[in-house]
């Protein structure tokens, strides 16, 4: 079935059908209010509130489908985009800040190899043969034997298939359990939102980008509200400058107030909020509140 012609009024959005990115993609789409129900046996789901069809594909195939214009949008790893050589055919719209891992060269922990240069001309196993080949070509003109394996790459050294592997690593625990250690990082990767340069739905693409940016901002920031004497306003604003700027309002002056007061509201990186609250209190701010941001547009 040619979905491009079968669903002419819907933007085709490719997302990973399983694996490390699938669940987080679904959570991201839910946060962006892209509503859908997926049958267990189908790799197509129609959005119930937007003119979008979600196409569930292997992450490695998504850059090709988007790059060739078969899908308008896609979510996949930066590693897969580079491996598929599709950067000339797609727009890299957003780093989605999840699925972070490293494409590393791993060797037996008790072996002789300590530097990548020692592996030139040896047997390397990887699911990323293009990236691996490019890396070793930069090291030497001498050819390196790079073989493709689709899964369980970490077992290759123990089985005698390879002298080293090139594979994605998150925590590194799987590699340690397989008796491997990292000697080089080829690429740091995460999930990215990409679009086809041939998309017929630029307005819907922009809407989705704005929604996803809002979800990411809501995950990254909290809203910090507090009151402060006007005399320390400038100092407080250096502590909470806001994402673009803080919102400052004048408070009604009570009869027993010796000076004017202001209410300040500012977006603060959630990783820094504890220190920010301590600094505000030390500066003389009061009534310091932190509120979650469920969603926003930035």
Curated annotation (Swiss-Prot):
GO molecular function: ATP binding; ATP phosphoribosyltransferase activity; magnesium ion binding
Known EC number: 2.4.2.17
Compartments in which it is found: Cytoplasm
GO biological process: L-histidine biosynthetic process
Gene Ontology annotations for the cellular component aspect, listed alphabetically: cytoplasm
Alphabetical UniProt keywords: Amino-acid biosynthesis, ATP-binding, Cytoplasm, Glycosyltransferase, Histidine biosynthesis, Nucleotide-binding, Transferase
Catalysed reaction, written as an equation: 1-(5-phospho-beta-D-ribosyl)-ATP + diphosphate = 5-phospho-alpha-D-ribose 1-diphosphate + ATP
Pathway: Amino-acid biosynthesis; L-histidine biosynthesis; L-histidine from 5-phospho-alpha-D-ribose 1-diphosphate: step 1/9
Functional note: Catalyzes the condensation of ATP and 5-phosphoribose 1-diphosphate to form N'-(5'-phosphoribosyl)-ATP (PR-ATP). Has a crucial role in the pathway because the rate of histidine biosynthesis seems to be controlled primarily by regulation of the enzymatic activity.
HAMAP family: HisG_Long
Name of the protein this chain belongs to: ATP phosphoribosyltransferase
């Amino acid at each position: 079935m040619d979905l491009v012609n079968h669903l002419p009024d819907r933007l085709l959005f490719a997302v990973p059908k399983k694996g490390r990115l699938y669940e987080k993609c679904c959570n991201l789409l839910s946060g962006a209010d892209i509503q859908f129900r997926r049958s267990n046996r189908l790799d197509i789901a129609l959005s119930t509130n937007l003119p979008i069809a979600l196409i569930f594909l292997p992450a490695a195939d998504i850059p090709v489908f988007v790059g060739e214009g078969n899908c308008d949008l896609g979510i996949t790893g930066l590693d897969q985009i580079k491996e598929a050589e599709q950067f000339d055919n797609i727009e890299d719209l957003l780093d989605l800040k999840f699925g972070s891992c490293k494409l590393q060269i791993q060797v037996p922990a008790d072996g002789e190899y300590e530097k990548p240069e020692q592996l030139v001309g040896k047997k390397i196993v990887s699911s990323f043969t293009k990236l691996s080949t490019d890396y070793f070509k930069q090291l030497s003109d001498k050819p390196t034997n790079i073989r493709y394996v689709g899964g369980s790459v970490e077992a290759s050294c123990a089985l005698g298939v390879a002298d080293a592997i090139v594979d994605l690593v998150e925590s590194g625990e799987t590699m340690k359990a397989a008796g491997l250690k990292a000697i080089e990082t080829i690429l740091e990767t995460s999930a990215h939102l990409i679009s086809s340069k041939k998309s017929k739905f630029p307005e819907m693409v922009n809407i989705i980008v704005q929604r996803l940016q809002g979800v990411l901002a809501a995950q990254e920031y909290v809203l910090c509200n507090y009151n402060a004497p006007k005399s320390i306003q400038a100092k407080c604003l250096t502590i909470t400058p806001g994402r673009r700027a803080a919102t400052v309002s004048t408070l009604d002056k009570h009869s027993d107030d010796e000076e004017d007061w202001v209410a300040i509201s500012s977006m603060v990186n959630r990783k820094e909020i504890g220190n920010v609250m301590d600094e505000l209190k030390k500066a003389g701010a009061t009534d310091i509140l932190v509120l979650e941001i469920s969603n926003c547009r930035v």
